[in-house]
């Protein structure tokens, strides 16, 4: 069974295309017009072993907000599509990622119930030209459109780039753990209720 998602989202502000394969090898082609976001998407792909093809055109002459958010929306929708009814997955994932002095913990549940708890404390307002407040907005968009319950905790860190990159690496590894197939669960839905809510169906 191919666990893939493909989304083409067009608004008056952006045109975003996402192709995602949960059972990939970490191949990534990201061209969003936002260089730092491309770099973080590469972390998700590489450390999550998710194949990603993402292209976006947006009103970055104004700022990166709309592109950042709409890429997050499309990634979340593609993830929900790839997971389907979430049959056979581990469901839960957790990872603690160090990057030099930075240490970030991520725990997530492919529950179908979107929730974000976020406690990064990023010292600088920008990394290059990227507004660091957009990190949270990206994850809000992913969570709301994928049905993830996501907790992000910063345990240490002083360098803004290190903190954010550790966050994306931890997210990637936790997502990989949660979405991998559990051979002991076979075709069962990982819930005592026998069903998990699907994003957009709550």
UniProtKB/Swiss-Prot annotation:
Tell me one GO biological process term.
L-histidine biosynthetic process
What gene does this protein come from?
hisB
EC number(s): the record gives: 4.2.1.19
Q: What is the protein named? A: Imidazoleglycerol-phosphate dehydratase
The pathway it acts in is: Amino-acid biosynthesis; L-histidine biosynthesis; L-histidine from 5-phospho-alpha-D-ribose 1-diphosphate: step 6/9
GO CC terms in record: cytoplasm
Q: Any idea which GO molecular function terms this record carries?
A: imidazoleglycerol-phosphate dehydratase activity
Q: Which organism is it from?
A: Synechococcus sp. (strain WH7803)
HAMAP family reported in the protein's UniProt record? HisB
Which reaction does this chain catalyze? D-erythro-1-(imidazol-4-yl)glycerol 3-phosphate = 3-(imidazol-4-yl)-2-oxopropyl phosphate + H2O
The root-end lineage is: Bacteria, Bacillati, Cyanobacteriota, Cyanophyceae, Synechococcales
Under which main EC class is this enzyme filed?
lyase
Q: Which Pfam families match?
A: IGPD (PF00475)
Record key words, sorted: Amino-acid biosynthesis, Cytoplasm, Histidine biosynthesis, Lyase
**Keyword Amino-acid biosynthesis belongs to the record:** yes
């Amino acid at each position: 069974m191919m666990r893939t998602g493909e989304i083409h989202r067009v608004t008056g502000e952006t045109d975003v295309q996402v192709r995602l394969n949960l059972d990939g090898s970490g191949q990534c082609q990201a061209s969003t017009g936002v260089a730092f976001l491309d770099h973080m998407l590469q972390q998700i792909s590489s450390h999550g072993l998710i194949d990603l093809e993402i292209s976006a055109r947006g009103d970055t002459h104004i700022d990166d907000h709309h592109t950042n958010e709409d890429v997050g929306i499309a990634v979340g929708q593609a993830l929900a599509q790839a997971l389907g009814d979430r049959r056979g997955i581990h469901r839960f994932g957790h990872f603690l990622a160090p990057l030099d002095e930075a240490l970030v913990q991520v725990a997530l549940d492919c529950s179908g119930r979107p929730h974000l708890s976020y406690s990064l404390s990023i010292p600088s307002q920008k990394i290059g030209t990227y507004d660091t407040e957009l990190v949270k907005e990206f994850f809000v968009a992913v969570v709301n459109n994928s049905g993830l319950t996501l907790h992000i905790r910063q345990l240490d860190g002083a360098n803004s780039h290190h903190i954010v990159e550790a966050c994306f690496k931890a997210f990637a590894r936790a997502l990989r753990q949660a979405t991998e197939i559990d051979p002991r669960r076979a075709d069962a839905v990982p819930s005592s209720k026998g069903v998990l809510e699907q994003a957009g169906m709550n």
